Design a protein with these regions (language model features):
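Amphipathic alpha-helical segments of the small helical/lid subdomains adjacent to P-loop NTPase cores
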Residues: 1-5
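Accessory nucleic acid-recognition modules appended to NTPase machines
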Residues: 9-172
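Hydrophobic/aromatic beta-strand patches that form the interior of the parallel beta-sheet core
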Residues: 115, 173-175, 204-206, 220-222
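Hydrophobic, well-ordered secondary-structure elements that form the walls
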Residues: 145, 163, 175, 194, ...
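Nucleic-acid nuclease catalytic cores
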Residues: 157, 198-218
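Short active-site-adjacent structural elements
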Residues: 162, 183-186, 212-216
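Active-site ExK catalytic segment of metal-dependent nucleases
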Residues: 172-182, 190
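Domain-level recognition of nuclease-like catalytic cores that cleave nucleotide substrates
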Residues: 209-237
Length: 237
């Protein structure tokens, strides 16, 4: 919930801290977008922001958002939604991650994921509404991979999703992210798609295991806090 906003650490009171963070987002990002692109429907912009924050780590598209936000009276144009989404990405409020067909080695055009640049923006704006720690952790890992210089994609293999395919020059990582893998079914759900990948690049499951890293049939199981704290090169061993 703390995020990476340096100025927020000046505030001891949690409510004051999150008010500050929300104000930073509204002032430096949303207001700047409104002025730069001469937004004619600021209410729609705010609704799109809230929708994207509420659906971090979910596949989405401009058309899906337009359909979800369209009420009984007003029809929302998906092209307008797409423009607003692009403006938010241009302002680095969100990062767009495309889907990649691992077997076919091609990019997929339909539905991307948009990750929030700092997950604490979501908490400051929406509180604990629909809070899913698995999706929050996935968002954190996406931003960290980008920070480490990887090109990041959502992997698709035999209609199953690999959370991340991370590529940097001749390096490649396949990563699954989960809040808790103590349940056997959850563990299998996260590991099995990785086991179906036939190449020799590293395959990781990042989860809150609170234990030493270990391997399962060649898949590295790593505590997500340890992975975030380590030097980037160590994740490739």
């Amino acid at each position: 919930r703390e995020g990476g906003m340096a100025g927020s650490y000046l505030y001891q009171d949690p409510e004051a801290k999150y008010d500050y963070i929300a104000d930073v987002f509204d002032t430096l990002i949303v207001r700047d977008i409104r002025q730069k692109y001469k937004i004619r429907n600021p209410i729609l912009m705010n609704r799109i922001v809230d929708f994207l924050m509420d659906n971090i780590s979910n596949l989405t598209s401009a058309r899906n958002i337009a359909d979800a936000l369209t009420g009984n009276k007003d029809k929302i144009n998906h092209k307008t939604v797409g423009n607003y989404m692009q403006y938010l990405c241009n302002a680095f409020a969100f990062y767009r991650v495309r889907r990649y067909d691992i077997q076919g080695k091609k990019y997929l055009a339909s539905s991307d994921k948009l990750y929030l640049s700092d997950h604490t923006f979501r908490y400051a704006k929406l509180g604990t509404k629909n809070l899913d720690y698995g999706r929050v952790l996935e968002n954190i890992v996406a931003i960290e991979l980008l920070r480490r210089g990887y090109e990041v994609y959502v992997g698709v293999l035999y209609k199953k999703e690999i959370d991340f395919v991370a590529i940097k020059r001749n390096e490649k990582l396949y990563i699954q992210v989960s809040d808790n893998i103590s349940d056997e079914k959850t563990f299998e759900r996260e590991v099995n798609p990785l086991l179906q990948i036939k190449d020799a690049y590293p395959k990781l499951v990042l989860a809150r295991i609170r234990d030493e890293a270990y391997q399962y049939e060649g898949v590295q199981i790593i505590d997500i806090a340890d992975w975030l704290a380590e030097q980037p090169s160590t994740s490739q061993k």
